[in-house]
Amino acid sequence: MAKPEPDVVVPEGDPAKGAKLFKSKCAQCHTINKGGSVKQGPNLFGFYGRKSGSTDYAYSDANKNSGIVWSDKHLFVYLVNPKQYIPGTKMVFAGLKKEQDRADLIAYLKEASSK
């Protein structure tokens, strides 16, 4: 069963600040450029608006069966605690607790994953 989109308001984010967060918190496991390599985690290019677990990567069944289509609202809640939002995910990231950090990272991810 698909996870419904959360009823949250996502603050405006700053992509430049999000880029710094990506570099310090995400880049060790993810790339985000077209044709980028798969590391411990999948390349995130083009993931925004796509169904979770649907690219060429060995996703967990939890990700593949979540029914999530990545949006601001899903990412905003997911990034607090990935393992709580999708129990069984392979994502080992502990999460970002600050709302503005999540908003900044989302702004960057949306921008960078479409270039």
Swiss-Prot record:
Q: Where, per UniProt, does this protein localize? A: Mitochondrion intermembrane space
For this protein, the record's InterPro entries field holds: Cyt_c-like_dom, Cyt_c-like_dom_sf, Cyt_c_1A/1B
Give the GO molecular function terms: electron transfer activity; heme binding; metal ion binding
Q: Which GO terms describe its cellular component?
A: mitochondrial intermembrane space
Entry-linked Pfam families: Cytochrom_C (PF00034)
Keywords assigned by UniProt, alphabetized: Electron transport, Heme, Iron, Metal-binding, Mitochondrion, Respiratory chain, Transport
PROSITE patterns named among the record's database cross-references? CYTC
Q: Source organism's superkingdom? A: Eukaryota
Ligand binding (heme c)? C26, C29, H30, M91
Biological role stated in the UniProt entry: Electron carrier protein. The oxidized form of the cytochrome c heme group can accept an electron from the heme group of the cytochrome c1 subunit of cytochrome reductase. Cytochrome c then transfers this electron to the cytochrome oxidase complex, the final protein carrier in the mitochondrial electron-transport chain.
The protein's name in its UniProt record? Cytochrome c
Source organism per entry reads Theileria annulata
